[in-house]
């Protein structure tokens, strides 16, 4: 079965079995909602077990979750550093123009017909996502995911068309 990373357990939260998760999910509210089925992978990326979310809340930059049958700090401390993943079957359907992060990572980024680089990471600093574009011989380009910049995302052809606003690329 194919799995996709949605978060990393970075610490415990309190004594009642809550976990502090650093989310890398494109749909965190949906992914961590009560009843969601996820898979737990250890620090060597080996499958450990299926888990079910019983509660979720946001706190600062973290998602605080509690898993079924894990109700005390002693039961969850060993999972620090583990990864939560969603199976391909549990991803859900997307609306027109929506896509998953794993579909964007690795896409070629073009301005007109000039290859700029490849999306290597997606950051979530605030109001909009920022795509980190790996370029050859240059520093990474931070590309805001906003309509004036990202013109088209062609998932089947793994291509992103952009128009770089003045000042966005400080190496040109």
UniProtKB/Swiss-Prot annotation:
Keyword presence, Chaperone: yes
Presence of the UniProt keyword rRNA processing in the record: yes
Major location category of this protein: cytoplasm
GO molecular function annotation: ribosome binding
Domain PRC barrel: 96-168
Known function: An accessory protein needed during the final step in the assembly of 30S ribosomal subunit, possibly for assembly of the head region. Essential for efficient processing of 16S rRNA. May be needed both before and after RbfA during the maturation of 16S rRNA. It has affinity for free ribosomal 30S subunits but not for 70S ribosomes.
Family that this chain belongs to: Belongs to the RimM family.
NCBIfam families (UniProt xref): 16S_RimM (TIGR02273)
Self-association state and partner proteins as the record states: Binds ribosomal protein uS19.
Domain text: The PRC barrel domain binds ribosomal protein uS19.
Name listed for the protein in its UniProt record: Ribosome maturation factor RimM
Origin species: Streptococcus pyogenes serotype M3 (strain ATCC BAA-595 / MGAS315)
